[in-house]
Design a protein with these regions (language model features):
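Juxtamembrane/disordered regions of integral membrane proteins
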Residues: 2-175
Length: 175
């Protein structure tokens, strides 16, 4: 998505650009941006995130199962749907900051780095202690690599779906 100023800064009459930007605002509203981010994140969880878990499990590099329907407390929601919900929320965060990455970066790279860093750091230093687990997987490299790999795949998928849905929703995406 282009920055607001990009829509009108190159027009000879700034007021014409401002009107165009205002008229287009309904399609580019924050709610629409968040919806695209949420759907992108949820779809990325169901495909890229769970897909890489399935591949790593099949290779024997990870103990766990993809697409688990095991109930998650406190509401008993199936794990895969719980993950898709949280992936959708992370997709909203990505949608809000996607335009802040350097313009020289491809969106897939921004998504990959976002996924590998943001959800992983929160998981290590916020979620794990709340669950009574060791911070950052106990700082054991043999266990630490899993988070950035799985979440990096998630971020890549979020960026892919974000670009597709953004183009579908409105023309003029920067990617």
């Amino acid at each position: 998505m282009r920055r607001l100023t990009d829509d009108w800064s190159n027009t000879p009459d700034a007021s014409v650009g401002l009107i165009t930007t205002t008229l287009g605002a309904s399609r580019r509203s924050p709610a629409a941006l968040l919806l695209i981010g949420f759907v992108s994140g949820a779809l990325a969880t169901l495909t890229f995130h769970q897909g890489i878990i399935w591949v790593l499990s099949a290779l024997g590099a990870l103990q766990g199962s993809a697409y688990s329907w095991r109930p998650v407390e406190p509401f008993g929601v199936p794990q895969v749907l719980n993950l898709a919900f949280w992936g959708g929320l992370w997709g909203c965060v990505f949608a809000l900051i996607a335009d802040r990455f350097p313009r020289s970066w491809p969106l897939w790279l921004a998504g990959l780095l976002f996924g590998a860093i943001a959800p992983t750091v929160v998981g290590w230093f916020v979620i794990a202690p709340l669950r009574g687990q060791p911070v950052a997987q106990g700082f054991e490299p043999a266990r630490m690599w899993v988070g950035p790999v799985i979440n990096g795949a998630y971020g890549l998928g979020t960026a892919v779906f974000y670009a597709i849905l953004q183009r579908w929703a409105w023309a003029g995406s920067r990617w």
